[in-house]
């Protein structure tokens, strides 16, 4: 199998954000929207298992979540090519990672290469003559507590079983069945309840391990391995590399610095890592009620971090992957039908985080053209969720007002007029009561992290958390006063790029008559050093001065989690010059693109060209914007207009 020439994947630097608490991502081998991300786990580890700054390795595991909090999730079926009593260290000069592939050498002479399909990890180990080929496997390894595990030798080259572990932050459980197959027969030694050693004899110098995964059965996990048995390691690697090249070749950019292109395509790559397609070949999937269902008309997805990703990543997938997004949205509707919690349930198919604000995501997909969604199927579950929305703190009330607003729109779509009006009134009254009491009159307490029970933020940051009601904020405060307050917010470094609650706020200047402020702030956030006063949970004792996005292992500002593609999608939107300020609305707010020219090939066959003209300075303000010859006066463009393709031209002063 001949690999395609790397065009845009050559710009991807998988080590961005892998060092310390600066992103919490990993450079593992993965396919787009796959169950597998196979990678070394360091000791001590990050949330994603891997830490660029640490050379000591506890082993190589098959899965992890990208950039999430708590202790992460995954870390299953960890393999060590040396005994647990011996230390294993990465030789950093030999480390390499490209989309779908990871390789390194260890200081003891062992070399490893990793690649993956959607549901199979492929691990190749090469041993020096001084060492006998052997693999120590921990069937109970996990980044959270393991509940149960079981393994059984099936043949001289195969072990099958399952592992059940707690999900992120200790909520709920997932269960993975596996089929582990080796290229050479093994002897099973040092066998214990959850661990074993596989030895291969003195003559074997190279061992390949293929681990198929399934949420349903070991038989399906075995089928995953059998599916690719005629393809060798290089074939699998090339196939996955081609998948990534196709995924990233939908967008071409010109202009900007090389670091800008590297950060852009690395960010683009990370928007397509999840959620995971967990359906069996015949469409079977595990419902969150523990029952197995069969779908004939969609693929079932799992692995959610919606509190973060509804804001940017899923609007990005609505635009660039509408067919897959239809399946993802349908999966969420089925989640409502089989039993949805805000966090993980007890019957998950993969490691997963949380699913708040799914109704906003579903509304966004519908209003942007993905209308073949059966809201009726999940409507009862949605209604139940509306009755248990959290209301303990001001931030929860603001976010619940957003959910109720979206639910009102969904009820209207399916003809439930009484429900729609009830949810609309609840949303408006909840927002008005909360905003006027907690957020309208600015006090010094607005700068205090977690004041009055706020989650990972300040009152300043949550003040803008209901963008659907920006007109009401203007009505109560006045546009000039609100703009002055927003300017103060940025001038005094009260904005936090390192967490999600206020990442849409730079675009509010468009709605307040100062679009040049949006342009200046967004570009600065993407490219310039800035003062960061806040981390994820507290105010820094000494503010951090530096870039929020860097082409380096410390790729994000301190304590800034990449959050499963959220921050990556934020960067991609900003670099292209438009952004979904109000998720659930059909409009994008416009800003100055980072690049001189962007070509976006849409899945409907249309091509959108974004072009800058007359920009002599990188921070020059926009003079006018035209779409297919028509002037855009309000710095907004609808999704349905954008996907027609054509030319979006930015002219500069």
Where are these regions (language model features)?
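Conserved, charged catalytic cores of large soluble enzymes
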Residues: 405, 409-412, 443
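Accessory carbohydrate-recognition regions in carbohydrate-active enzymes
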Residues: 5-314, 318-360, 367-390, 395-398, ...
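Long, well-ordered, tryptophan-enriched scaffold segments
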Residues: 434-443, 448-450
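Hydrophobic, small-residue-rich alpha-helical packing segments that form membrane-like cores
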Residues: 399-403
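Bacterial N-terminal signal peptides
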Residues: 1-2
């Amino acid at each position: 199998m001949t690999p395609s020439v790397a065009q845009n994947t050559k710009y991807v630097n998988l080590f961005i954000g892998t060092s310390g608490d600066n992103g919490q991502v990993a450079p593992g081998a993965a396919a787009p929207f796959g169950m597998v991300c196979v990678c070394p786990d360091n000791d001590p580890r990050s949330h994603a298992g891997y830490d660029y700054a640490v050379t000591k390795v506890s082993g190589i595991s098959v899965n992890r979540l990208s950039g999430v909090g708590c202790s992460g999730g995954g870390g299953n079926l960890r393999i060590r090519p040396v005994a647990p009593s011996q230390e294993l260290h990465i030789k950093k000069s030999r480390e390499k990672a490209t989309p779908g592939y990871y390789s390194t050498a260890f200081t003891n002479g062992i070399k490893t290469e990793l690649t993956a399909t959607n549901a199979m990890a492929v691990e190749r180990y090469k041993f020096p003559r001084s060492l006998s080929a052997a693999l120590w496997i921990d069937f109970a390894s996990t980044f959270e507590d393991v509940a149960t595990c079981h393994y059984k030798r099936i043949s001289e080259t195969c072990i099958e079983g399952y592992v059940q572990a707690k999900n992120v932050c200790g909520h709920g459980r997932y269960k993975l069945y596996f089929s582990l197959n080796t290229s050479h027969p093994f002897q099973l030694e040092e066998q214990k309840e959850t661990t074993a050693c596989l030895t291969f004899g003195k003559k074997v110098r190279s061992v390949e391990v293929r681990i198929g995964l399934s949420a349903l059965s070991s038989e399906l996990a075995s089928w995953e391995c059998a599916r690719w048995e005629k393809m060798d390691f290089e074939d699998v690697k090339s196939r996955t590399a081609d998948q990534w090249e196709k995924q990233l070749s939908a967008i071409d950019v010109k202009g900007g610095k090389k670091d800008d292109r590297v950060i852009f395509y690395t960010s683009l790559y990370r928007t397509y890592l999840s959620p995971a397609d967990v359906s069996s070949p015949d469409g079977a999937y595990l419902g969150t009620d523990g029952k197995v269902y069969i779908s004939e008309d969609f693929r079932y997805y799992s692995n959610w971090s919606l509190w973060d990703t509804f804001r940017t990543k899923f609007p990005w997938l609505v635009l660039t992957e509408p067919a897959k997004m239809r399946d993802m949205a349908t999966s969420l509707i089925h989640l409502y039908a089989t039993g949805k919690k805000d966090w993980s349930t007890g019957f998950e198919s993969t490691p997963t985080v949380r699913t708040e604000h799914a109704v906003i995501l579903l509304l966004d997909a519908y209003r942007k053209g993905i209308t073949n969604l059966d809201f009726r199927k999940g409507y009862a579950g949605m209604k139940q969720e509306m009755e248990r929305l959290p209301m303990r703190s001001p931030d929860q009330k603001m976010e619940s007002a957003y959910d109720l607003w979206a639910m009102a729109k969904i009820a209207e779509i399916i003809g439930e007029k009484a429900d729609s009006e009830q949810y609309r009134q609840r949303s408006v009254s909840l927002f008005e009561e909360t905003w006027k009491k907690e957020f309208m009159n600015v006090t010094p307490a607005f700068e205090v992290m977690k004041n009055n029970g706020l989650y990972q933020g300040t009152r300043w940051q949550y003040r803008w958390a209901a963008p659907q009601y920006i007109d009401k904020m203007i009505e109560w405060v006045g546009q000039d006063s609100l703009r002055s307050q927003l300017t103060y917010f940025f001038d005094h470094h009260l904005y936090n790029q390192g967490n999600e609650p206020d990442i849409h706020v730079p675009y509010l200047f468009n709605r307040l008559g100062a679009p040049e402020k949006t342009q200046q702030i967004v570009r600065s956030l993407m490219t310039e050093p800035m003062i960061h006063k806040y981390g994820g949970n507290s105010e820094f004792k000494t503010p951090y001065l530096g870039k929020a996005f860097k082409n380096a292992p410390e790729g994000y500002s301190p304590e800034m989690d990449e959050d499963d593609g959220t921050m990556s999608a934020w960067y991609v939107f900003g670099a292209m010059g438009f952004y979904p300020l109000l998720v659930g609305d059909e409009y994008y707010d416009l800003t100055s693109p980072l690049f001189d020219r962007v070509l976006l090939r849409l899945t409907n066959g249309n091509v959108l060209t974004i072009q800058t003209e007359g920009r002599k300075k990188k921070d020059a303000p926009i003079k006018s914007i035209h779409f297919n010859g028509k002037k855009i006066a309000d710095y907004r463009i609808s999704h349905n207009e954008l996907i027609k393709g054509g030319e979006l031209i930015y002219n500069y002063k």
